[in-house]
Amino acid sequence: MASTPMGNEGEKKSSWPSQAAPSLRGGPASLSRSEEYLSQISAELMEEALCTACCHLNPVPIKKKQSQDQATQISKRAFFTKT
């Protein structure tokens, strides 16, 4: 039983370098493409997150202001109608 996990680990170790070797042969060109792709995705996600955050933040103060304005208008109407 102890030999089975060792055998699996040995297989993982032996298969990992063979998969990594082609990317290492590509050198900086492969790495720069990956970095470029990741930075592009990161920028898109950041832009989407900022847009979502702005969309969620802006309506809240507007709604509060509108409700305050409506309350003021109601109180003014009530004040003028009483006199």
Curated annotation (Swiss-Prot):
Spans annotated as Disordered: 1-33
Name of the gene encoding the protein in the UniProt record: CDIPTOSP
Protein name: Putative protein T-ENOL
